[in-house]
């Protein structure tokens, strides 16, 4: 066959691929510039008037290059996932793939946390004066404490106001650690291990959702990126990683319910977890946006929806019956937020710097994937990639609403973890996954070794 008889499609395909890669790189470069701008402008503001209350804008962190006992393990996990992750994700049986993602994600998070050492990285993270373990002894009588919970939210309303994180969350967050203590798993070490091990299952919830609503091929392509997410820098050790897992499984069960997988059971279980989610964190009420995206994508909504709603009311009814009123507590939290750094931090800076923080949380690969997801949505082709784009868009909208609320000024590298994880599946749309995975790993390793993060 002569060359003039060869089809032109391969050349066109190569041209399109090169064009798309350039656009991916432009998107990544724009994200780098956004973060650089936030760093420069934030440093100027902090040096001028100190209103940001962060030492290394836009992150709550200190510049402190260091290595630690977790360094060799973190590098080893990164190399292994980059080298073998995509191939294993393509061929492992589905359940084994989920187990592998959880194992790799857990190892990645533990090793990154241990770069700061066992004490600072894990055992002491949840024992500071702001954290949940400081108030375990005040929950000896749980019903009485719940009835009186709102009396201690605002500073000045009580001589024993709650520390920041207890005041800033509904009581289910603190009760988690109270019950861990009661079953013999008390102290910062067990709390840290709990948050990392449970938090690592969030990736599985995301993958189950993508498989149910988009397709298995995209879920498999996303798997290595969820296992090796830069977000692990803040997942270990943070209670928000645990919150992210509860919320992710609520979404996953809803996705299974609306696609016909035991709709009554999965619908009820999803509702129960959604009810728990909003009593772990006020901000996670915005998961209603992600849930709405799931309902839009689901084809069998009618049967599971009543069960999901019935499950959802259980946790709120229990807490309300015990004397804790969510809406009253949130109103008092707004006052408490304004009493602290949140009342001083300038929204004009944080409204865009918060987004710059997410560049480090989700990585440049996710930025490129989001560009591709946006292109797919604009084409409006009803493909698996389009459905994935809708799911990712739901998470992005929830994040933007949180940003505009003014209740998320700074520290969003931790606070928005439950939303950020849902952006990572966009990486499934990228070709050449190993190069992008390597970029994700290098970013996480640099952040963890150059900075001492606040979380």
Predicted segment positions?
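Hydrophobic, aromatic-rich transmembrane alpha-helices
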Residues: 80-86, 359-385, 398-403, 425-426
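Membrane-interface helix-loop-helix junctions at transmembrane boundaries of multi-pass membrane enzymes
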Residues: 301-306, 371-394, 433
């Amino acid at each position: 066959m002569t060359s003039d008889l060869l089809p032109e499609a391969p050349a066109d395909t190569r041209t399109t691929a090169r064009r798309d890669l350039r656009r991916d790189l432009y998107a990544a470069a724009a994200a780098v510039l956004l973060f650089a701008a936030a760093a420069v402008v934030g440093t100027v503001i902090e040096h001028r008037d100190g209103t940001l209350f962060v030492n290394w804008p836009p992150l709550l962190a200190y510049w402190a290059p260091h290595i630690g006992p977790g360094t060799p393990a973190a590098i080893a996990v990164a190399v292994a996932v980059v080298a073998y992750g995509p191939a294993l994700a393509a061929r492992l049986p589905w359940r084994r793939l989920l187990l592998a993602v959880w194992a790799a994600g857990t190892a990645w998070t533990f090793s990154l946390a241990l770069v700061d050492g066992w004490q600072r990285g894990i055992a002491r993270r949840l024992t500071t004066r702001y954290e949940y373990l400081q108030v375990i002894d005040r929950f000896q009588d749980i019903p009485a404490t719940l009835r009186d919970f709102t009396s201690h939210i605002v500073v000045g309303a009580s001589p024993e106001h709650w520390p920041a994180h207890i005041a800033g969350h509904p009581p289910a967050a603190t009760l988690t650690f109270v019950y861990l203590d009661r079953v013999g798993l008390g102290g910062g070490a067990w709390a840290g291990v709990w948050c990392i091990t449970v938090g690592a299952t969030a990736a599985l919830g995301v993958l189950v959702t993508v498989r149910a609503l988009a397709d298995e091929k995209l879920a498999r392509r996303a798997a290595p990126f969820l296992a090796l997410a830069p977000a692990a820098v803040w997942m270990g050790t943070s209670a928000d990683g645990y919150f992210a897992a509860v919320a992710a499984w609520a979404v996953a069960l809803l996705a299974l319910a609306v696609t016909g997988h035991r709709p009554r059971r999965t619908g009820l279980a999803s509702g129960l977890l959604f009810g728990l989610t909003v009593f772990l964190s006020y901000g996670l009420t915005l998961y209603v946006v992600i849930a709405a995206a799931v309902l839009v994508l689901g084809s069998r909504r009618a049967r599971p929806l009543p069960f999901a709603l019935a499950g959802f009311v259980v946790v709120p009814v229990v807490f309300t019956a015990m004397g804790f009123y969510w809406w009253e507590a949130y109103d008092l939290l707004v006052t408490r937020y304004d009493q602290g750094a949140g009342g001083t931090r300038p929204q004009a800076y944080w409204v865009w710097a918060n987004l710059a923080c997410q560049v480090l949380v989700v990585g440049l690969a996710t930025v490129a994937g989001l560009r591709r997801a946006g292109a797919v949505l604009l084409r409006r082709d009803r493909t698996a990639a389009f459905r994935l784009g809708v799911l990712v868009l739901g998470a992005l909208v929830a994040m933007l609403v949180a940003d505009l609320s003014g209740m998320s000024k700074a520290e969003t590298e931790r606070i928005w973890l439950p939303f950020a994880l849902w952006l990572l599946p966009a990486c499934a749309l990228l070709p050449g996954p190993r190069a992008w995975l390597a970029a994700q790993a290098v970013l996480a390793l640099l952040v963890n070794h150059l900075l001492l993060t606040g979380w």
